[in-house]
Amino acid sequence: MLSLGVNIDHIATLRQARRTVEPDPVAAAVIAELAGADGITVHLREDRRHIQDRDVRLLRQTVRTHLNLEMAATEEMVAIALEVKPDYVTLVPERREEITTEGGLDVAGQVSRLRDVVGQLQGSGIPVSLFIDPDPTQIAAAAQVGARWVELHTGRYAEASSAAQRQVELDHLEKASQQALQLGLRVNAGHGLTYWNVGPVARIPGMEELNIGHSIISRAVLVGLDRAVREMRQAMGLS
């Protein structure tokens, strides 16, 4: 069944803009869950630009749905994940100069290293998802390294400049989902999804979870977080 993972990074972005204590992502996670979020997602970046170590540790204690920790495949982040033990980890690419994650992880180009990281995490009981572009080579590599999930990068779909191009990108996502399922992978998706473009992605066969942050938090500024989460669930066709 399709579910909604709410990414609360930008609650922390607002807090860090003033280097203060509010708004608190931990409190936001509680509100999101009460409004119907099926999971909470946070990205602990190496530069700590928004989510902080404190947030991850407190969220592990307070989240009642599931906690998805997005992180780079570095020794530091693996050590934190092994300590905190989120419900699952999503490995993502990371560059300090980027505003947000700009593309999928190049799994095919680092199979040996990622196999080791995935094995270390999953050997400790932490399932691993890989954030990848909807590319056949990357999907095959994700299966090769032993990941449980792939999260398909929906950025090109979200940024398509015409209906025709959007349909092309949607077709790529559908084919990628089908390939992943055939290889025994579970399928999530995210990046750039909004209230206005989420519907077709939500209807892709086999899709398990959509991770959405910026659109929900942007709307929450105007209507409140509870309503913003509920409206996203409606846009996804969830009750």
Curated annotation (Swiss-Prot):
What is the name listed in the Swiss-Prot or TrEMBL entry for this protein? Pyridoxine 5'-phosphate synthase
- Stated EC number for the protein is 2.6.99.2
Q: What keywords were assigned to this record?
A: Cytoplasm, Pyridoxine biosynthesis, Transferase
Q: Name one GO biological process term.
A: pyridoxine biosynthetic process
Family in the record: Belongs to the PNP synthase family.
Cleaved signal peptide residues = none
Subcellular localization is given as: Cytoplasm
- Residue positions annotated to bind 3-amino-2-oxopropyl phosphate are 7, 18, 192, 213-214
Binding locations of 1-deoxy-D-xylulose 5-phosphate: 9-10, 45, 50, 100
Q: Which residues cross the membrane?
A: none
What pathway does the UniProt record associate with this protein? Cofactor biosynthesis; pyridoxine 5'-phosphate biosynthesis; pyridoxine 5'-phosphate from D-erythrose 4-phosphate: step 5/5
- One GO CC term on file: cytosol
Outline the subunit composition.
Homooctamer; tetramer of dimers.
Q: Broadest EC class?
A: transferase
Q: Name one Pfam family in it.
A: PdxJ
Gene Ontology MF term list: pyridoxine 5'-phosphate synthase activity
Which residues are responsible for catalysis? 43, 70, 191
Q: Give the chief site where it resides.
A: cytoplasm
Kindly state which reaction or reactions the protein catalyses: 3-amino-2-oxopropyl phosphate + 1-deoxy-D-xylulose 5-phosphate = pyridoxine 5'-phosphate + phosphate + 2 H2O + H(+)
Free-text function comment from the UniProt entry: Catalyzes the complicated ring closure reaction between the two acyclic compounds 1-deoxy-D-xylulose-5-phosphate (DXP) and 3-amino-2-oxopropyl phosphate (1-amino-acetone-3-phosphate or AAP) to form pyridoxine 5'-phosphate (PNP) and inorganic phosphate.
The reply to whether Nucleus figures as a keyword in the UniProt entry is no
Q: Where is this site: Transition state stabilizer?
A: 151
Q: Which CDD domains match?
A: PNPsynthase
